[in-house]
Amino acid sequence: MKKFRWVALVVVVLACLLLWAQVFNMMCDQDVQFFSGICALNQFIPW
Protein backbone atom coordinates (compact mmCIF):
# COMPACT_ATOMS: atom_id res chain seq x y z
CA MET A 1 0.00 0.00 0.00
CA LYS A 2 2.92 2.31 0.72
CA LYS A 3 4.23 1.81 -2.81
CA PHE A 4 0.91 2.97 -4.27
CA ARG A 5 1.14 6.17 -2.25
CA TRP A 6 4.57 6.93 -3.73
CA VAL A 7 3.29 6.31 -7.26
CA ALA A 8 0.34 8.64 -6.64
CA LEU A 9 2.69 11.31 -5.29
CA VAL A 10 4.96 11.08 -8.33
CA VAL A 11 1.97 11.30 -10.70
CA VAL A 12 0.67 14.42 -8.92
CA VAL A 13 4.09 16.09 -9.02
CA LEU A 14 4.48 15.33 -12.74
CA ALA A 15 1.00 16.69 -13.46
CA CYS A 16 1.86 19.90 -11.59
CA LEU A 17 5.11 20.27 -13.55
CA LEU A 18 3.28 19.86 -16.86
CA LEU A 19 0.68 22.43 -15.82
CA TRP A 20 3.44 24.82 -14.69
CA ALA A 21 5.23 24.39 -18.03
CA GLN A 22 2.04 25.27 -19.93
CA VAL A 23 1.45 28.36 -17.79
CA PHE A 24 5.08 29.31 -18.41
CA ASN A 25 4.64 28.99 -22.17
CA MET A 26 1.50 31.13 -22.05
CA MET A 27 3.34 33.84 -20.12
CA CYS A 28 6.22 33.71 -22.59
CA ASP A 29 3.84 34.00 -25.54
CA GLN A 30 2.33 37.13 -24.00
CA ASP A 31 5.86 38.48 -23.44
CA VAL A 32 5.38 39.41 -19.80
CA GLN A 33 8.29 41.62 -18.75
CA PHE A 34 8.90 39.80 -15.47
CA PHE A 35 9.17 36.44 -17.22
CA SER A 36 11.51 37.55 -20.02
CA GLY A 37 14.66 36.36 -18.21
CA ILE A 38 13.05 33.11 -17.14
CA CYS A 39 11.76 32.54 -20.67
CA ALA A 40 15.34 32.76 -21.97
CA LEU A 41 16.29 29.99 -19.54
CA ASN A 42 13.11 28.11 -20.42
CA GLN A 43 14.32 27.66 -24.01
CA PHE A 44 17.12 25.39 -22.75
CA ILE A 45 14.81 23.16 -20.72
CA PRO A 46 13.26 20.44 -22.90
CA TRP A 47 9.63 20.30 -21.76
UniProtKB/Swiss-Prot annotation:
Gene Ontology annotations for the cellular component aspect, listed alphabetically: plasma membrane
Topology in the lipid bilayer: Single-pass membrane protein
Protein location: Cell inner membrane
Transmembrane helix is among the record's keywords: yes
Membrane-crossing residue ranges in chain numbering: 6-26
Keywords linked to the UniProt accession: Cell inner membrane, Cell membrane, Membrane, Transmembrane, Transmembrane helix
Location (main, coarse): membrane
Keyword Cell inner membrane: yes
Gene Ontology BP term (one): negative regulation of phosphorelay signal transduction system
The protein's role, per its UniProt record: PhoP-regulated transcription is redox-sensitive, being activated when the periplasm becomes more reducing. MgrB acts between DsbA/DsbB and PhoP/PhoQ in this pathway. Represses PhoP/PhoQ signaling, possibly by binding to the periplasmic domain of PhoQ, altering its activity and that of downstream effector PhoP.
Protein name: PhoP/PhoQ regulator MgrB
Organism: Escherichia coli O45:K1 (strain S88 / ExPEC)
Gene that encodes the chain: mgrB
